[in-house]
Amino acid sequence: MFISISAGIVTFLLTLVGIPAFIQFYRKAQITGQQMHEDVKQHQAKAGTPTMGGLVFLITSVLVAFFFALFSSQFSNNVGMILFILVLYGLVGFLDDFLKVFRKINEGLNPKQKLALQLLGGIIFYLFYERGGDILSVFGYPVHLGFFYIFFALFWLVGFSNAVNLTDGVDGLASISVVISLSAYGVIAYVQGQMDILLVILAMIGGLLGFFIFNHKPAKVFMGDVGSLALGGMLAAISMALHQEWTLLIIGIVYVFETTSVMMQVSYFKLTGGKRIFRMTPVHHHFELGGLSGKGNPWSEWKVDFFFWGVGLLASLLTLAILYLM
């Protein structure tokens, strides 16, 4: 436990030092920052804010987790799988950000390219993961999927990777939402005695807390796709490594809600010839524009943050209660 906590403290301190250096480099190199293409007027002031800050907490967390696990003899197949997903999905996000920032391609990777790279990473992940079994936990009951587990694994990894990416649209929202989710999985890992997974979790929590100091409103830096895609993939990988896949539907209710809102909006828009359910999706923008109803007073970014963090915290506590108190 001491090793895991130490890993978290080290990544926190490294990120605390690394982010200002990253921002300074970004400014000195005169790199064009985040472009704003949203209809939320208050976001226009954020244009030019340095992005790709997720690169800092990703590198520090992966390296610290790797070396701490290695030298404490806790490096395992689980640790390797989770770090692999972090690196690979981080690379996909980095390429996407690179095209947007340096090549001025607003779309970055097109959806097919991004999906292909995410699926490739998922397949490689499965080749290692299958050693751990092909059993899917459905609300605590084992379901043997055999070869078909690969299809679930790909859906889980790609789905939650993109879901966290969609959530990253308000200052600080995604970073603390993931901290809450990881904290819940940290408890599960500790109870299961999987200290290797706990080490990776605490390392990332430390990195995210260090990043949040510069990412809360008004954000001095954004994590970019390099951070959000990696974090979503990490959550999916951890849920599988702990054989508690179903828990991510509750622990990750914020990401599920954000993604579902987009799917509902697009489907309803097509079916009705242009009508909308929400004022704007992902749904956190709906709240920004008009509160819960969409017709009330606009919510500040802090209010949106605390609402979603509260939902995420309650969902995480509910999951732990279901697992260990019922």
From Swiss-Prot:
GO BP: cell division; cell wall organization; peptidoglycan biosynthetic process; regulation of cell shape
NCBIfam families from the UniProt entry: mraY
Pfam families given in the database record: Glycos_transf_4, MraY_sig1
E.C. no: 2.7.8.13
Function as written in the Swiss-Prot or TrEMBL entry: Catalyzes the initial step of the lipid cycle reactions in the biosynthesis of the cell wall peptidoglycan: transfers peptidoglycan precursor phospho-MurNAc-pentapeptide from UDP-MurNAc-pentapeptide onto the lipid carrier undecaprenyl phosphate, yielding undecaprenyl-pyrophosphoryl-MurNAc-pentapeptide, known as lipid I.
The family this protein is said to belong to: Belongs to the glycosyltransferase 4 family. MraY subfamily.
MF term (GO), any: phospho-N-acetylmuramoyl-pentapeptide-transferase activity
Cofactor: Mg(2+)
PROSITE patterns, A to Z: MRAY_1, MRAY_2
Localization: Cell membrane
Cellular component GO terms, alphabetical: plasma membrane
Pathway annotation from the record: Cell wall biogenesis; peptidoglycan biosynthesis
Major site of localization recorded for this protein: membrane
Disulfide pattern: none
Membrane topology: Multi-pass membrane protein
Protein name as it appears in the record: Phospho-N-acetylmuramoyl-pentapeptide-transferase
Transmembrane segments: 3-23, 51-71, 79-99, 115-135, 138-158, 169-189, 195-215, 221-243, 306-326
InterPro entries, A to Z: Glycosyl_transferase_4 (IPR000715), PNAcMuramoyl-5peptid_Trfase (IPR003524), PNAcMuramoyl-5peptid_Trfase_CS (IPR018480)
Keywords, ordered alphabetically: Cell cycle, Cell division, Cell membrane, Cell shape, Cell wall biogenesis/degradation, Magnesium, Membrane, Metal-binding, Peptidoglycan synthesis, Transferase, Transmembrane, Transmembrane helix
The reaction(s) this protein catalyses: UDP-N-acetyl-alpha-D-muramoyl-L-alanyl-gamma-D-glutamyl-L-lysyl-D-alanyl-D-alanine + di-trans,octa-cis-undecaprenyl phosphate = Mur2Ac(oyl-L-Ala-gamma-D-Glu-L-Lys-D-Ala-D-Ala)-di-trans,octa-cis-undecaprenyl diphosphate + UMP
